[in-house]
Amino acid sequence: MSRNDDEQARGSRWERETQDLSTQVEYLQEELALARRKLTETPGHVRLLEERLAATKAQVERMSEQNERLVATLKDAREQIVTLKEEIDRLAQPPSGYGVFIEAREDGTVDVFTGGRKMRVALSPSIEPESLRRGQEVLLNDALNVVESLGFERAGDVVTLKELIESDTGHPDRALVTSHADEERVVHLADSLTNAPLRAGDSLLVEPRSGYAYERIQKSEVEELVLEEVPDVDYESIGGLDGQIELIRDAVELPFLHADLFAEYELRPPKGVLLYGPPGCGKTLIAKAVANSLAKKVAEARGDDFTGGDRAKSYFLNIKGPELLNKYVGETERHIRLVFQRAREKASEGQPVIVFFDEMDSVFRTRGSGVSSDVENTIVPQLLSEIDGVEGLENVIVIGASNREDMIDPAILRPGRLDVKIKIERPDAESARDIFSKYVTTKLPLNEADLAEQGGSREACVQEMIQQAVERMYTETEENRFLEVTYADGDKEVLYFKDFNSGAMIQNIVDRAKKMAIKEFLNSQRKGLRLQHLLDACVDEFRENEDLPNTTNPDDWARISGKKGERIVYIRTLVSGKGDESGRSIDTVSNTGQYL
């Protein structure tokens, strides 16, 4: 019984073990199936993970770019905030004032002029006191301390220097100046003017509030009226005036070049020369040539090298006569004094000085001839005293030019003032040839046909052109008749174009001919100056002058044109095509009042 029980027990245990093994086998089979299924699904899962990884990387890159943009935006915003803060701080700062530096003190303070007050203020440590210059502008903070040095003032009033005032050290540090209202004032000289060559009559820039003069205006009051240079004109460029040139060279150059001989013979050099004659005949040209020639001769006498880059030095003060006149009483006289003061300064340097008054009759008229202002009553005596004052000086001569010498005050023309009087006549035929030769030269392009007529000789061609042009101008033919004048006694006289020729007219004729040659070349490609151009230019020049005599009082016109003698009362033009026009007579006007 017990044996059977044991067997049953073993059988039951085997069944249980068998069931357990079966269960384990099923579990292992399921696990194996699951493993097989997972092994089959693994590649797809890996691909899914790779896709997720790639998407994650792309998202990370996008976030990085976005972060970089945000960082840049934050930086820009920070910079803008800083800039705005600086702008706000700058706008919130109190205003800075300007002052004028006067003097530095030993204790480190400085004296400045600001707001109409003279103050002693502190100096910023960043500024060296030695770097500040008197009259210099400085910047002041809200505590009125100097924080920055600036330049010199460049705007203000223009005044005239009258006299320099020296300090205790012997150097000028102040100046006596006058304004246009003749108000005198003493001003300080800024350091910018300490070493500047200042002289009476100079124009200075003054800041009226601080009382400092900062700058010398280059165009001073006298320089507005004179041309201080050596003209580039020589005697060779003047034609037809050999006799007059010889006279003025004797009057001007000999005293300068041979002063010892003049002293030995006790001969006083002439003080002045008057050049008079009709307009356009070379008065101003001769005066310029005198200055140029005198500069060269003086340089040669002193052994200077005139051929180098430096020009020979002399001074030609070309006074613009009408501009001397000023509406303020005494201003014209003061200008004359300044002109001669400038001449004395230049002469003291040992250089020849020529004071040239062009259109002298416009300023120095006969005293008592004026009707309304009578300014000549004071201007003429001022010039007389200045010319007499030149007597004690060397190297100064006065040259006057006028086409109405009859209107100049006789006291100016007497010996001892304008000693030498040279009349510049209208050119005759021989003089006209000489003048033409200055403008019609072999260097000009000449027409081939005209050259062929002279055998290809340029010299012969030019001479033929000049000869034909002079004959056209000076022949007393019907076509050259210009005017018929009637004198007060009833006599009549026919005047030809040759009676009114001048060097300026000849130059104008040549210029017309050259312009005709240029226009012909542009239109027909025929190059070169032709004789016909000169002849046509003569006709055009004459035609332009047809109406000129009738534009003014005949008697005054005759005086200006150089026709002196009995008074002319009637003028009639005789130019072809003008026969229907009547002349112009003189009407006697009575009770003219004070204005005529």
UniProtKB/Swiss-Prot annotation:
InterPro entries for the chain: AAA+_ATPase (IPR003593), AAA_ATPase_domain (IPR050168), ATPase_AAA_core (IPR003959), ATPase_AAA_CS (IPR003960), NA-bd_OB-fold (IPR012340), P-loop_NTPase (IPR027417), Prot_ATP_ID_OB_2nd (IPR032501), Prot_ATP_ID_OB_N (IPR041626)
Region called Docks into pockets in the proteasome alpha-ring, residue ranges: 595-596
Involved pathway(s): Protein degradation; proteasomal Pup-dependent pathway
Coiled coil regions, renumbered to chain: 12-94
Binding site residues for ATP: 280-285
GO MF entries: ATP binding; ATP hydrolysis activity
SUPFAM superfamilies in UniProt: P-loop containing nucleoside triphosphate hydrolases
GO CC, alphabetical: proteasome complex
GO biological process, one term: proteasomal protein catabolic process
Annotated Gene3D superfamilies: 1.10.8.60, 1.20.5.170, Nucleic acid-binding proteins, P-loop containing nucleotide triphosphate hydrolases
Keyword match Chaperone: yes
Keyword Manganese: no
Keyword annotations of the record: ATP-binding, Chaperone, Coiled coil, Nucleotide-binding, Proteasome
Pfam families in the cross-refs: AAA, Prot_ATP_ID_OB_C, Prot_ATP_ID_OB_N
NCBIfam families (UniProt xref): pup_AAA (TIGR03689)
Domain statement: Consists of three main regions, an N-terminal coiled-coil domain that binds to protein Pup and functions as a docking station, an interdomain involved in ARC hexamerization, and a C-terminal ATPase domain of the AAA type.
Subunit composition and interactions: Homohexamer. Assembles into a hexameric ring structure that caps the 20S proteasome core. Strongly interacts with the prokaryotic ubiquitin-like protein Pup through a hydrophobic interface; the interacting region of ARC lies in its N-terminal coiled-coil domain. There is one Pup binding site per ARC hexamer ring. Upon ATP-binding, the C-terminus of ARC interacts with the alpha-rings of the proteasome core, possibly by binding to the intersubunit pockets.
Function: ATPase which is responsible for recognizing, binding, unfolding and translocation of pupylated proteins into the bacterial 20S proteasome core particle. May be essential for opening the gate of the 20S proteasome via an interaction with its C-terminus, thereby allowing substrate entry and access to the site of proteolysis. Thus, the C-termini of the proteasomal ATPase may function like a 'key in a lock' to induce gate opening and therefore regulate proteolysis.
UniProt similarity note: Belongs to the AAA ATPase family.
Descriptive protein name: Proteasome-associated ATPase
Encoding gene per record: arc
